[in-house]
Swiss-Prot record:
Residues 31-133 form the Phytocyanin domain. Residues 166-191 form a propeptide. It is a lipid-anchor; GPI-anchor. It comes from Arabidopsis thaliana. This is Early nodulin-like protein 8. GO terms for molecular function: electron transfer activity. The gene is ENODL8. The lineage of its organism: Eukaryota, Viridiplantae, Streptophyta, Embryophyta, Tracheophyta. Disulfide bonds join 87-121.
Length: 191
């Protein structure tokens, strides 16, 4: 094998690695969601705010939910499906009251959140999030109806290393396209 053909082979290998890395970057990025896209977690003016909001997002492992609220006025708890349905705030899975609650999504499943403050849940300050795939159970447990389902406890943690945005997705997509085009051009020149 001559030096020239070895160089061409190396270029093709490097380009293939770049394409694979570009595709993997998109898979490992995560998104930080501000719950409800609102300024604060609280009793909603529209009763369907927290039931509509998760339907417009695809949550995956590695994403995070950020609940913002005045700590002297509100709180956040994770509850079981039956407690979500009945607005029972006793014996929560997890309780936070720091006003800047970050919840990392660490496994697939359905999660149930509400305020620990009396009466807030019955005023629709509650959120059901399906991680991994859309769930018919999420639809069934919207404020108008409910059914029991398994609950998954997740741990809180630090802010994710990267926050996926439409700009980063576009950049990754553009990088992959350019790398693929270059690889095709090099392979075509070799042939």
């Amino acid at each position: 094998m001559g030096v020239m053909s070895l160089s061409k082979t190396m270029v093709v290998v490097v380009l293939q690695v770049m394409i694979l890395l570009g595709q993997e970057i998109g898979k490992v990025s995560s998104t930080l969601y501000k719950v409800g896209d609102l300024d604060a977690w609280g009793i909603p003016i529209d009763a369907k705010v927290y039931s509509k909001w998760p339907k417009s997002h695809s949550f995956k492992i590695g994403d995070s939910l950020l609940f913002l609220y005045p700590p002297s006025e509100d709180s956040l708890i994770q509850v079981t499906p039956s407690n979500f349905k009945s607005c029972n705030t006793k014996d929560p899975i997890l309780y936070m009251n720091d006003g800047n609650s970050l919840f990392n999504l660490t496994q697939n499943g359905t999660l149930y959140f509400t305020s620990a403050n009396p009466g807030h849940c019955t005023k629709y300050q509650k959120l059901l999030v399906s991680v991994g795939t859309y769930s018919a159970e999420a639809e069934a447990l919207s404020p108008s109806s409910a059914a029991d389902a398994p609950s998954y406890q997740n741990a809180f943690g630090s802010i994710p290393l990267s926050q996926k945005s439409s700009a980063s997705s576009s950049l990754i997509s553009a990088f992959s396209t350019v790398a693929a085009s270059l690889a095709c051009a090099v392979v075509g020149a070799i042939m």
